[in-house]
Amino acid sequence: MAEKIAPPRWLKPFNAVVLVARRVGLGWTRELPVLVLPGRRTGKLRHTPVSVLDLDGHRYLLAGFPGADWAANARAAGVGILAVGRRNERVRLVELAPADAEPVLRAWPVRIPQGAKIMRDAGVVPDLEPDSFAALAGRCAAFRVEAV
């Protein structure tokens, strides 16, 4: 997974603003899921807004870009906290094999259209078709979220 596509330049500052807004409880940000993982080098807790896909009774996270830092931190740590609203849930993140990731990837543009549009606009996929997302299997990490 050496390939790395840069996220849009506005994404990191936008995420920082969203995290501050969430912390003070502003509007829609209150219920925004945030993944909290230790950094793989520093051990410092890293907070990343995420989209959680509910599919067939399981929850999934998708790294929106090949080489995403949070995905590398998830691989290194294996466990973290999924914070939604005032609830903090300790979770295990299990990376899916490419074949297992395909149905999750196919569902992504249908169930998480805003995240899918960001991926398209950044050049990760050419369009919003489920087949284009399925082709990301093995390039963009997909994780099953399990309660610990």
Identify the role of each PLM range:
Residues M1-L26:
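Extreme N-terminal tail/first-helix region
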Residues L19-R22, H47-T48, E129-D131:
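A generic local structural motif
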Residues R23-G25, R59-A72:
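Covalent nucleotidyltransferase core used to form phosphodiester bonds in nucleic acids
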Residues W28-R30, G138:
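Short gly/pro-enriched beta-turn/loop segments at secondary-structure junctions
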Residues R30-G64:
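Short beta-strand segments
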Residues V36, R144-A147:
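Short, well-ordered beta-strand micro-motif
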Residues F65-F143:
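Short, structured beta-strand-loop surface elements
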